[in-house]
Amino acid sequence: ISRDYNQVHINPLDTTLATFRIDYPFYKEGVGHAAVGALGQASLPYNYFERPQYRNFSFAEGFDVYTYRMENVPFYNLKRPYFHFMYLESGQKKFREENFSLTLGHNISPTTGFNVNYRSRGTKGLYEWSRTKNHNLSVAVSHTGKRYSVHAGFINNHIETRENGGVVGEWAIRDTTFEMPSGVPMKLTSSEATNTYRNNAFFVEQSYGIPLLPVTESDFSIANLPAVFIGHSFEYNSWSKVYKDVRGTYTDDRYERDADGNFVPQDGLEYYKNWFINPTQTRDSIYERVISNRVFIQAQPWDRNGVVGTVNGGVGLDLHTYSQFRLDSYLNGKYDKVDKSSYFVYGSVEGKIKKYVDWGADAKFYPSGYRGGDVSFGANLTLTGYIRKRPLILEGRFRMETRSPDYWQENLFSNHYVWLTPLRKENETRFEVAFRVPDYAFEVGVWQGIVTDKIYYGADSQITQDNGTVSVTSVYARKDFRIAGLHLDHKVLLQWSTNHSVIPVPLVSAFLSYYYEFWAVRDVLRVQFGVDGHFNTRYYAPGYNPALSEFFNQ
């Protein structure tokens, strides 16, 4: 469901055969992600243009492929009750990965239904101190009548991770043999570092349609009539993060070489350089809440599928609350709380020309106050042709944004990192062109992005802002071959960045999946077996800082 309008987005048909063999969600789309570790842990897409950009609580960006949000909560319209259960596990009990999902959907009437989706993914970890639990729940209710429609939902995301800080050196993986992976030395093992994330959200979006022509009994809906829709969107969304550790050290057996070329070990090394609040242990608690209200109008001049399908407009007000520990908390006995409000106007227009052309344009502007001056506008055009009833789809997209930094990028007080840093707005322009032939599993795409004043985390994990302009170009190709039951799937991504110290990307990334598929029992049990391969060229891959829950450039 759209945040701005009571407008649903149709998802591809969900089947157990589509990418069923891929149990890591960060490998299902594109060429995959650079992952911190196993199932349930943070990851970052190789494709720069697929990387999430959260306006609120950016600490959760690394878990984007797992979490439910208002825009990705599924709704179902069913003729029969639907139930789907899945449980997968792998590895020995001591290192086990588990993937559990449950979906229940039911329509009370042809226009009213509800569904529950629950996902639990996690690992006990091959490496020391890497256990992760990732739980995600969504409960949704929808009603789509002739005039009145409503979509509502509740979301709970709960993530617990043990943070080991990564290996003490490349030598521990590259040219050293350990009897078990659990023997590989990690930087934060003795520190017993953990992160706990909690998210609760509730939303309801509703609209009422006023037809401009009489509605007859034969009209199933007013989508084919001139009409005006008036609606309201409400969302309550709260996130919290608690990071804990104790002061510990690690030993690097190959810290440096002496004059004879022999390795010299170094003990007493610490992962964090600073302990601002407590010199022996850490408990950093951060809380953020956003209460959002939007009022919108959708004008339908002719019908929903007309040349000008809808002309939309709305106003919104977001109430932000941020809470963290500060030195003042010693005096007043409670965490510091900051309240901010941002208001904005937005609009869009979209239409179709039969089944051959889809087009749209949108804009959003914050006039003043918090995030004042932020602006976003974009356009899209889709051309569809047919050869022997097989579609050929050409898509183009454009987006230009000026956006303020996240609150935590300018204000942070924690045991290991402290900053009060005014930052400039980022400016980014993106172009995208894609060509798809679905019946032949063929797709190519090109992205071009130009970013000015990019905000990122430097090699010391400190917030940093570039003073120039960075250009990123990506070229993507996908082609799947099928020979009887044999599947040969290929995805390749090429990327270029004009400044790898600001936006590092691999030149080549690829994902290959070769497998054979057949019916073990006709129409009852289908089997797939094969091999998947991931590849990327050498580059300065991002590191991950547990205290900040952010990827940083190395």
Name these PLM-found stretches.
Residues 1-200, 209-224, 386-392:
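Membrane-proximal, glycine/serine-rich, low-complexity loop/turn segments characteristic
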Residues 78-80, 189-252, 256-261, 265, ...:
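Exposed, low-structure sequence patches enriched in small/polar residues
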